[in-house]
């Protein structure tokens, strides 16, 4: 599969998952979750879904557990929205790039 097509599939999956998590997922353990990126394998059998979660470490852990528990529902949403041969098995991973950027900014400001 071409990299351009992979990029389009990843972006489409990110949009579908973002909408499903924020508007359709009713689990109270899911806090303020943002899907930051999706990386699918070339054969579209696996997808890593990177999410950032606003809150303390306990809230993050509960949100990640709830997302992993709801992976079947979210996978069906992807299958229903996208026309792709295989629906990827979803794996949710915590994305700490926002935290790291804030920490670096704080360190730079302290150094001035």
Show which residues each predicted segment covers.
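Charge-rich, low-complexity N-terminal segments
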Residues: 1-47, 52-112
């Amino acid at each position: 599969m071409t990299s351009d097509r992979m990029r389009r599939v990843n972006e489409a999956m990110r949009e579908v998952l973002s909408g499903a998590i924020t508007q359709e997922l009713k689990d109270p353990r899911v806090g303020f979750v943002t899907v930051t990126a999706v990386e699918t394998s070339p054969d579209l059998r696996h997808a890593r879904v990177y999410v950032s979660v606003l809150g303390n470490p306990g809230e993050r852990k509960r949100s990640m557990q709830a997302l992993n528990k709801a992976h079947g529902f979210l996978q069906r949403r992807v299958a229903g929205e996208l026309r792709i041969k295989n629906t990827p098995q979803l794996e949710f991973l915590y994305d700490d790039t926002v935290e790291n950027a804030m920490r670096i900014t704080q360190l730079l400001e302290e150094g001035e």
